[in-house]
Regions:
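N-terminal secretory signal peptides
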Residues: 1-7, 31-33
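C-terminal helix-rich "cap/oligomerization" subdomain common to oxidoreductases
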Residues: 13-53, 121-123, 360-399
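N-terminal Rossmann-like dinucleotide-binding module
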Residues: 19-22, 29-101
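Contiguous beta-strand/loop segments that form the cofactor/metal-binding neighborhood of enzyme cores
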Residues: 40-49, 247-327, 357-368
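Predominantly a Rossmann-like dinucleotide-binding segment in NAD(P)-dependent oxidoreductases
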Residues: 55, 67, 171, 180-273
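Active-site loop of classical SDR/Rossmann-like NAD(P)-dependent oxidoreductases
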Residues: 67, 89-92, 348-359
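Short acidic low-complexity segments
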Residues: 105-115
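Beta-strand-loop-alpha-helix segment that lines the small-molecule cofactor/substrate pocket
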Residues: 121, 127, 132-180, 195
Length: 399
């Protein structure tokens, strides 16, 4: 075999020197001839999806510590919601909020929101460890709740949330925006449910983030507050940004039961904040699929956006890759979906799709349904990341 390789290499070098190399077929280099076609397409929403909202509700904001609140408001407004009141505590957040929504009534206490019987839904992006206790109070006052992620940061909070849901029959939503508010992620779900890649075997989520951003509502446009560095307050890296990814694992695999196989966390490069976690990963096992998640806070400035979020879904008949926020060194736009099946490879531009979450969530509030977000799945995602965080091995890398 070694002599054959040497003879082949010598032959290629000889004909390369004589200019004959370009005439050889790809098969001479071990490449297979093309077998599958390649297609590019632009996904469009069905006409009924783009119709005006079917329902209307009044909603309020109670806590705006993270700028995710703006995306949450936008989703509910697209669904037919009217923002009627808001409450916040941080002066700089209040100033930015009132500039964006000058006509919204600002109140001076949480109670003013909770006791207003005209309000059906409360949104909050308050400090993470305060979100679940607020949600319990909201539900006890007969209102539905939509929290920024992480919506729950301890098992004790989770028990209280489940108990209150059972007693009040209210909705406790968590905005897992990396699936619910990403058009390509929505399209991936549609393809998977249609059987485009067969039965899902595994999901892999790569979720880099950026601490300091130049602009936008992802959280770092104006620097990070003190609570951002304290895992007691933000929940830890697996509980916080990992919640997006575990939601996707459950949704795409269809798992209703799952466990954390292994998890680890580290502070690799932030010695000034010794309790902060800038890296974490976890492995999951569900009753209908497997999952792996990697998280970090190391997005470099050269990327041009806050993170190169990737989703990979392996199926028995094909696979899907979603490049959510950019296509590195190719184009800046996100919502890029790639699918390979038994017939062809396709690229799908998903930017023209309409996001369904807002209208669906508002309809759920009116109709007492769970179309936008399955309640059990929502809370299972929270439970898994809390357990992953609680049981994670802390890793110390040598410098």
């Amino acid at each position: 075999m070694e002599n054959q390789d040497l003879n082949r290499r010598s032959f290629l070098q000889t004909i390369g020197a004589t200019g004959l190399l370009v005439a050889l077929p790809d098969a001479a280099f071990g490449a297979r001839p093309e077998r599958g076609s390649i297609a590019h397409e632009t996904a469009q929403s069905a006409p009924d999806v783009e119709a005006k909202p079917q329902y209307s509700i009044n909603f309020a904001v109670c806590g705006m510590s993270h700028d995710h609140i703006y995306g949450m408001i936008g989703a509910i407004q697209r669904g037919g919601g009217t923002l009627v009141a808001a409450y916040g505590q941080e002066p700089e957040k209040l100033s930015a909020f009132t500039k964006r929504y000058p006509d919204v009534r600002m109140v001076t206490s949480e109670e003013a929101i909770l006791n207003d019987k005209s309000i059906q839904l409360v949104l909050s992006s308050t400090i993470p460890n305060q979100r679940a206790p607020l949600g319990v109070r909201v539900m006890e006052h007969g209102k539905d709740y939509l929290s920024d992620k992480p919506g729950i940061t301890s098992l004790e909070q989770l028990t209280a949330v489940r108990k209150t849901i059972a007693e009040t029959h209210r909705i406790y939503g968590i905005m897992y925006s990396e699936r619910l508010e990403v058009k390509a992620a929505v399209k991936a779900g549609e393809l998977i449910q249609a059987g485009a890649i067969g039965r899902v075997i595994q999901t892999i989520n790569i979720a880099p983030h950026q601490i300091v951003q130049g602009h936008g509502d992802a959280g770092g446009g104006t620097g990070r507050p003190e609570w951002f560095w304290n895992p007691d307050l933000y929940g830890g890296i697996l509980c916080d940004i990992g919640s997006h990814q575990v939601d996707q694992f459950l949704y795409y695999t269809g798992s209703t039961e799952a466990e954390v196989v292994a998890s680890q966390i580290a502070n690799v490069n932030h010695p000034d904040h010794p309790r902060f976690q800038d890296f974490g990963d976890m492995m999951l096992r569900g009753d209908r699929g497997l999952g792996y998640v990697r998280l970090d806070w190391f997005t470099p400035d050269g990327l041009g956006t806050w993170g190169d979020g990737r989703l990979f879904v392996l199926g028995t008949e094909g696979y899907i890759e979603v490049r959510k926020y950019t296509d590195v060194a190719v184009k800046k736009s996100g919502n890029n979906l790639f699918i390979v099946d038994q017939k062809e490879a396709r690229y799908i531009d998903c930017n023209n799709l309409t996001l369904p979450f807002g209208p669906q969530f508002v309809a759920d509030i009116v109709n007492r349904t769970h179309v936008a977000q399955d309640q059990a799945q929502c809370l299972l995602a929270a439970e898994l990341v809390i357990k992953a965080q609680k049981n994670a091995q802390t890793v110390y890398l040598k410098t």
